[in-house]
Amino acid sequence: MLKSVQGLWKDFFGIRDDGRKREYGSLDEVRKRSALRSRRKQMRPTGKSVLKRPRKVTDRKTEEKIRTNRRKTPKRRLTKIFQTIRDVFSNDNENMSKMQNVCGDMTRILKKRSQGRPSYMDTDTAKSRILRSDAFKRKISELKYNKQRISELRSGSSDGSSGKDRNQSLYLDREILLQRQIKKRDEKIKALESKLQSLQEALNYSNEKYRILEDLLDSSNIHPSYTKSRRTMSNLARENDEIKPLKIDLSPSPIRRTNSLFTSSPMKTYNRDGNIPEMQPLQENISPACPTPPYRSRETEKEDETLSPISVDFSSYLS
């Protein structure tokens, strides 16, 4: 209590040391420090080699004045005084009782039953719901039927009663199979009905289109014979899919053989197709001034082996 009174006294007269205060020195020292800091920032290189300009340094004296004025406002001083007086006359027992009440409430809240689960999800209600469900009854009937079938297969007795039971089970199997077949047929009928409906709609659309085209043809001044001819042509094309040209086996074009006497090419032999007929050379005079040379066969060319354009008969010189 004595310490709190001393703190109140020091706060009232402004003698108490404030840890937030910091000695910055004189005004000249502060200015020197800010100038050095700005120079260092200018000399520091950057990634893009662009010098950063120093920020505008505010006057430290004005900042200190603002802080001292804020600190010495009467409102803050009054709040401090009231806080110290409250600390002097505060009662710890009251705080402890509040904490105890809060803890007691928490324990009571934790001990309460969780409200998330409804009452119908208890075990008894769940069992009753399962027993009353249709799925459970269906499963039990299937199990009974399976057990009955297994017992019939194992026994294999030829008594009248067993025969009746067997016939009854066969009837049941047939009934199940028939029901499945009926279901499949119904599905097929539905699919065919939907398809028939779509085809009916397409047919109605085509009929309407045909009627509109007929109206357009009637309104236009076209001769009926022309329209009939066009219709017959289109019908023929539809019947034959498309009009294709006739495929006729044409004979291959003959290859004219080159003669070395009349060409500068040294070609002597060539691969000729035997199926292609060889053309006979022209034996007629083009003009009297330029008579055609005598025809020489391939054998004589092979014997002479000459490329000269002038033919010489050496047999006259041998005699």
Curated annotation (Swiss-Prot):
Cystine crosslinks: none
Residues the record lists as Phosphoserine modifications: 251, 260
Stretches with biased composition (Basic and acidic residues): 56-67
UniProt GO MF annotations: lipid binding
Single GO biological process annotation from the record: spindle pole body localization
Keywords: Phosphoprotein
Annotated Pfam families: NBP1
Annotated spans, Disordered: 34-74, 278-319
GO CC terms, sorted: central plaque of spindle pole body; nuclear inner membrane; spindle pole body
Taxonomic superkingdom: Eukaryota
Basic residues biased stretches: 34-43
Note: Present with 339 molecules/cell in log phase SD medium.
Subunit structure: Interacts with NDC1 and MPS2.
Protein name: NAP1-binding protein
UniProt lineage: Eukaryota, Fungi, Dikarya, Ascomycota, Saccharomycotina
